Amino acid sequence: MKRKLLLMLLCAALGLGAAQVEVYRVENEKDVPADWAEKDTLRLTCIDTNRSDAMVLQSGGEAMMVDSGEGRYRKRVYATLDGYGITELKYLLNTHCDDDHLHGFIYLMYSDLYQVDAFLSPNTTTYVDEEGYHQQAVKATGTKNIPYVQIGDGDELTLGNAKLTIFRCPLPTGQNNRSAACMVQFGDSRAFLTGDIDNETMQWYAATYGEKLRCDILKAPHHGLATIPDSFVEQTQPQVLFVPNRSALSTKVTAGWVKNHMPGAALYFSGDGTATMLTDGTDWYIWQEPNYVDPQ
């Protein structure tokens, strides 16, 4: 049965004009209206990679990924890409170089399974991380002749008819807090992908960007392990919160926390099953698959 989450946004505050965004929670893609097959849409797929980030964006015949999950889950990523018939990725956007965000990209670039047009990172090619994943990624781009592009705060990208805006905190507070966050906008629909920013950076975002953070969909920062401050909730005002983690492992973002701090918001844990979010720029349809079982 289709469940409707009523979402009435004052779009004057967003600068988007008078519009109403509605979010529908459905059992599966079969519940999406048939005429949507002919529409120009944006699809956000949050792959079940346990407690790691791996997201696929598709719009206008183009596809990209934001983070890749741990390398051991790469076959789940490939199965998702292959299921969509994706053979080319316009961008591999790495928010920061922790293994649970970057390791899978290293495998993907060496796999030769997909054409990769560019690897995007907030770090320079000479940046050194202690675990060495960034250096491995830089080496892979050179070996496979993949353009390496450093991205920074305020940069804009396009994917089909979607616009992506990069947000990044300049404070020297560690690579998690300096993750390259990404606001994805398609028509009046907005999804904010936050990397691993923590409480301190969320407060800085709220004070610095204010209403620019408004979104319908929010990726819970740092796998639900970070306390989300009220100021960040006030500026983002999401109707859907998804956590790239298993519900049993998310210590800060829980059903009880959402009930108290984001009443009415829907909560998904993509570590409990891949979550897919589809929009035509006005409405969202969201569904979740069962927990992924790796083939034997």
Predicted regions mapped to residue ranges:
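Hydrophobic helical h-region of N-terminal Sec-dependent signal peptides
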Residues: 6-15, 263
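Core dinuclear metal-dependent hydrolase active-site scaffold
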Residues: 20-88, 150-214, 275-296
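Active-site environment of divalent metal-dependent phosphoester hydrolases
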Residues: 51-53, 71-73, 97-103, 126-129, ...
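Active-site metal-binding motif and surrounding structural segment of the metallo-beta-lactamase
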Residues: 60-64, 72-121, 208-225, 237-241
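Metal-dependent catalytic neighborhoods of phosphoester/phosphodiester hydrolases
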Residues: 102-114, 128-138, 230-234, 252-256
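Binuclear metal-dependent phosphoesterase catalytic core
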Residues: 182, 241-296
